[in-house]
Amino acid sequence: MLLIVVDYGVGNLRSIAKSIEKANFDNSLNYTVKVSSNVNDVKKSDKIVLPGQGSFKACISGINNIEGLQEELNENVLIKKKPIYGICAGMQLFATIGYEEEKTLGLNWIPGEVIRLNLG
């Protein structure tokens, strides 16, 4: 089984891949873990990890800067119902809109809004 960690220019991809590989080994799973920005790799994958580090806007821009990536993710998640795991800002992108820097459209897989926390 192929598990793709989507490389769209944000996140600590090496740490994520190593963590998944360790869990794979420790639990006798049979995943091949690949970090890739190639749309065809997403298409061929069995499971997808969408990491994210930084702002909502920067993350969605990273996805949109790779031709065909958002469309392929939508196809795999919404139509094929392929399992996807979001990490940090990667999961926030599942929402309709994010307001961290400015109003920014997300992937709209989960209806909702991501708002900036005012902690102080």
Residue ranges and their predicted role:
Residues 98-103:
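Conserved hydrolase catalytic core segment
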Residues 1-83, 89, 108-118:
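N-terminal beta1-alpha1 cap of cysteine-dependent amidohydrolase-like domains
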Residues 88, 92-94:
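Glycine-rich nucleophile elbow surrounding the catalytic serine of serine-hydrolase chemistry
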